[in-house]
UniProtKB/Swiss-Prot annotation:
Similarity field: Belongs to the ATPase B chain family.
Localization terms from the record: Plastid, Chloroplast thylakoid membrane
Name of protein: ATP synthase subunit b, chloroplastic
Lineage: superkingdom: Eukaryota
Taxonomic source organism: Morus indica
Length: 184
C-alpha cells in the first residue's frame, strides 16, 4: 500500500499556479491519468456499447421494414387508385356530354386523397426513423457516461483512503476555482 500512496503524498509539493516547475510524479500527470481512464472505459465499455448499438440497429431496421411494408401497402392502394382512375376515365369518355365536370372533380379528389395518404405514410416513416435514432443516441450517451463515472469512482475509491481523498478533492476544487477565475 505504501508504494501506491507515495505518489499521492507528493501532491503537497506541487508548484503554485503562478510559478513554473516540472512535475516528475508520473501518476499525477494528466495525460497518463486520462489515457488510463480512457483505456479502462474503452476496454469495459466496448462490449456493452456494441450490444447496445446492435440492439438499436435491429430495432431501427425493424422500424424501417415496417415502414417499407406500409409504403408497399400505400403503393398498392395507389395502383388500385390508378386502375380506378383509368376506369373513371373510360366512363368519362362515355358520359362526357352528361357529367364531364363531376367526373373530373371526382378524379382529382381521388388523386389528391391518395397522394396525401402516401405523403403522410412517408412522413410517418421518416419521423419514426429520426425518433428511434435520437432515442438510441441518447441511451448510448447515458450508459457510457454512467459507466465512465462508475469506473472512475471505483478506481478512485479503491486507490485513496479518506485523508488522501479529502486532500485530492480540496486540490481539485482549488484548481477548478483557479481555472474559473482565468476563464472569467
Amino acid at each position: 500500500m505504501k508504494n501506491v500512496t507515495d505518489p499521492f503524498l507528493s501532491l503537497s509539493y506541487w508548484p503554485s499556479a503562478g510559478s513554473f516547475g516540472f512535475n516528475t510524479d508520473i501518476l499525477a500527470t494528466n495525460p497518463i491519468n486520462l489515457s488510463v481512464v480512457l483505456g479502462v472505459l474503452i476496454f469495459f465499455g466496448k462490449g456493452v456499447l456494441s450490444d447496445l448499438l446492435d440492439n438499436r440497429k435491429q430495432r431501427i431496421l425493424k422500424t424501417i421494414r415496417n415502414s417499407e411494408e406500409l409504403r408497399e401497402g400505400a403503393l398498392e392502394q395507389l395502383e388500385k387508385a390508378r386502375s380506378r382512375l383509368r376506369k373513371v376515365e373510360k366512363e368519362a369518355d362515355q358520359f362526357r356530354v352528361n357529367g364531364y365536370s363531376e367526373i373530373e372533380r371526382e378524379k382529382l379528389n381521388l388523386i389528391n386523397s391518395t397522394s396525401k395518404t402516401l405523403e403522410q405514410l412517408e412522413n410517418y416513416k421518416n419521423e419514426t426513423i429520426h425518433f428511434e435514432q435520437q432515442r438510441a443516441i441518447n441511451e448510448v450517451r447515458q450508459r457510457v457516461f454512467q459507466q465512465a463515472l462508475e469506473g472512475a469512482l471505483g478506481t478512485l475509491n479503491s486507490c485513496l483512503n479518506n485523508e488522501l481523498h479529502l486532500r485530492t478533492i480540496s486540490t481539485n476544487i482549488g484548481m477548478f476555482g483557479t481555472m474559473k477565475e482565468i476563464t472569467d
